[in-house]
Amino acid sequence: QVASLVFESVPAERVIIMLRDDDGTDNMQIKVARTRGKLEPIDEVRISRTVMEEVLKNGQSVLTADAQHDPKYFSQTMALQGIRSVLAVPLSVDERTIFGLVYADSPTYEATFTEEHLNILTTLASVASIRVENASLMDARLERERMERELELATEIQQRFQPSAPPIVEGYQFQGISFSCYEI
């Protein structure tokens, strides 16, 4: 959905959405890679590492109207793919935790990106970030509920192993209580 909205709002030829791996490393996974009008195979996507690092490490959005002549962002990737204009914005819910990026580019001079395009992409990225965070919170909630059900079941099983009454031994009286040690 986000890629479609980007194509509707910005004159990009290609949109790529990347998210950090869940394993805590800085590895990025391409989640969406589309070229205007068709689905682009994920294993053939190449984007500028310089642009990616600027967004992910510094949290800064990138806008370059002519990447071929911009010394800060020009790279072999840009030259080989003939990329002229680039937009990239971070995906984050708070300013400190960047968990991905939205990248858009165009090979033509007719589709030069502007500050207005950057503002639009930033707004779309904010909405997408909130949706990703909500999905993550929902997954965590479902996992917590699953664990609670498993603990309840374990408590039931443990209670079934306990005798229903203390043993009767002449000359002795027994009393006892048993309850689960761990509860959330």
Task: List each model region and its residues.
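Regulatory loop-to-helix N-cap segments in sensory/regulatory domains
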Residues: 38-45, 93, 105-124
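Short regulatory alpha-helical segment in sensory/regulatory domains of signaling proteins that mediates
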Residues: 2-11, 19-21, 36-37, 56, ...
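… and, occasionally, acidic/histidine-rich disordered N-termini of signaling adaptors
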Residues: 142-184
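Signal-transmission/dimerization alpha-helices at domain junctions
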Residues: 57-63, 119-143
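A short, aliphatic-rich beta-strand micro-motif
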Residues: 84-93
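Regulatory sensory and allosteric helical modules in signal-transduction proteins
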Residues: 29-31, 38-76, 87
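GAF sensory/regulatory domain recognition
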Residues: 3-7, 14-43, 47, 52, ...
